[in-house]
Amino acid sequence: MKALLKYSLVVLMLLVSSFICAQKGMGDDGNLSGRKKKKVKVGLVLCGGGAKGVAHIGVIRKLEEVGIRPDVIVGTSIGSLVGGLYAMGYDSKQLDTIVSNADWNYLLSNSVQRSDVSFSKKLSEEKYFISIPFGADFKELRGRKEEESAGSILKNFPSGFCNGNNVLNLLNGLAVGYQDSISFDKLPIPFACIATDLSTGDEVVLDHGYLPLCMRASMSIPGFFNPVKIDGKVLVDGGVVNNFPVDIARKKGADIVIGVDVQSDLIAPDELESLDAVLLQLISLMGNDKFLENKKDANIYIKPDVSKFGTMSFNKEACDTLLVNGYKAADEKNDVLVALKKLLGEQNGADDTVLKARNIQESTFHVTNILFEGIDPEDEKWLMNLSGLKRNNIISGKEINQAISLFNGTDAFSQVTFLLSEDKGNNGAYILKFFFKPAPSNVISIGARYDTEEAAAMLLHLGIKENTLHGGRGAINFRLGFNPNANFSYGYVFRNFPRLDVNYYFKKTDVNIYSDKDSRNNIKFIYNGLEAAFANLKYFRTFDARLGVRLDNYKFLRFLTEKEKEVNTKAKSYLSVFTEAQMDNRDDQSFPTNGIQTKVRAAYYMLGFHGGFKAFASIYGNISGVWSPAEKFAVIPQLYTRINIKNKYEFPYYNYVGGSEEGRYVDHQIPFVGINYTSVFDNSLLVLRTDFRYNFAKKHYAYIIANYLRSGHEVGNMLSFKHSGLWGFGLQYSYRTKIGPLSFNIHWSDYNKKKVGAYLSLGYFF
């Protein structure tokens, strides 16, 4: 090893010395009068490798310690991200902070922060594990052959799993000062990145244009990220053709090339068992010959240990280890790097007089004007009101990012980016410009779940014109399973008027209902409902209010009771008016760490289309909050109540309590740990519950649950301590999965003291 190191030092010294001697200046006339030494250019080449590219930062840290500043940087994929930021002026410490603070699950997805999603989207989307937008124009498809229509629809599906919008806006926010179209030679360190032309398979060297977009193009992994269009070319990850672009660094004038290789070895045959492994292998094979050629041409070859990490290993522990491994690998070349620094002398690769990029998160700007491009002029005012931004005002970078997140939260746009450019008429001021790309307006979504009460179920959703700011939209939902249901809805969103919703509901239900501790009724019924309501006046993210009218129809197919009791099973219809309000500012639906969720609903049933009906009313309410006294511990208090007003009310509107899920068999069913299925209770009902949750591992949660129930014929009876209430307790384990929580609990209550129950579920509830 020592012999190899000495050999490397000798070769490096001879290379640099011979280069310097060869460049001793001659005058223009060929004489020796103009003796000058040409500056030796050092190139830094950073290859692709996904999360493994964090090791590049460790190498840069070592170069900074030695004092080597490259004259040119060339990167591919993640190497373009790290290299581009370094070229803009971010040092290794800042790069480490950026990587450590980044929410990679968010960046590598199409997600919008829950706080920025509209309330209606919260209600609808947190049921599905996959949603696929598409933009087929159904008018255009009308009249075509069936196979042509299907093909036209498929062409409008997205070209990648992730649109890359979140990554692009991260880069945009870090490139303030270099967001406009420029030559990358004007950066503090000249820079270039590599992409692949998807139409020809050719290598594309990106050394001018919109820097963040070029960096994003270079890391467009085929199938994962949507391709990027630049100058009429459809570009994907440069690693397909040139993952270690030493040759490009040479063309950019580099005399000495430091190459950092974080590419994994080719995958063994017995490990090619998954789709991602096959895709990565294909990409590696396509550019392998050029990779081997460039590897030989690197003067200083640095190979960090990335053997234990994958393309998506962006968790904090992995990033910390990769950074250390990068530093260690560079430190093993310490003698060579020190020798190179001595030969270079005081020459500095970076031009310290060139302005460094600003991080938008740490800056404020005097913005004289805000412009919008790519939207209907009539929507501009609406979006301005939504963002809360004001022209001729001091605006922070966080406010700009918040506005982008709000725009994305409408789901009307597949891409929202921004540009901060200097206002030439006002010294030190900026013009903020937002760019919008419309999203596919339609969506197909799929949800799936299993639980021990109803077995397996699937939810299918088709939204037509769903991802639009205003106008009409429709949706069709089918729940397939033991208790199937369907929902057909149409809504019209006005710009300056409450939203109008019209819904038709169908539901077939087979359920065991307990009328007391020992008596069970088996009921099977068909429900049809028609509802029209006005909803929020404007775009609300945490609040929703509705006012409407509803027609319910119940047809009982079976009503088996263990006690002799007359039950009228004829079809019955009820007309009601209702109002409801909901609020939800929790940071997560399934495992929140802060926030409050509440719902209040009042209904007046004024008509029953059968004899003996008397008008009655009902009031329902629930509230839950999350308090986190420690990092992994949460206390979740909850309250549920429902009161039927008037002594005589109808069977479908009794108070039903039981099970782990709210609203399973009837909309107003209240959950209670310790009672399986559902049971009937008196007119006035109150349930208090507290969950104690501990996050003992990354996605693993343990619960202790206690709930208490009181009921009475009237509110006074319910609150009276002349009779005792019911207690229920449970222990639960939950695991966060991509299709929803996996949960198992065991429970007991004094409603039925003889039995300990159990419940298993997987997936979001619907």
What are these regions (language model features)?
Residues M1-D29, I643:
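Bacterial Sec-dependent N-terminal signal peptides
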Residues A22-T76, G84-S405, G409-E422, A439-P440:
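Patatin-like phospholipase
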Residues G49, G79, L95, G201, ...:
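Buried hydrophobic packing residues in well-ordered domains
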Residues V443-I446, F578-Q582, R586-A697:
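C-terminal outer-membrane beta-barrel translocator/porin domains of Gram-negative envelope proteins
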Residues N467-R473, R495-R499, Y539-D544, D587-I596, ...:
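Short loop/turn motifs that connect adjacent beta-strands in outer-membrane beta-barrel proteins
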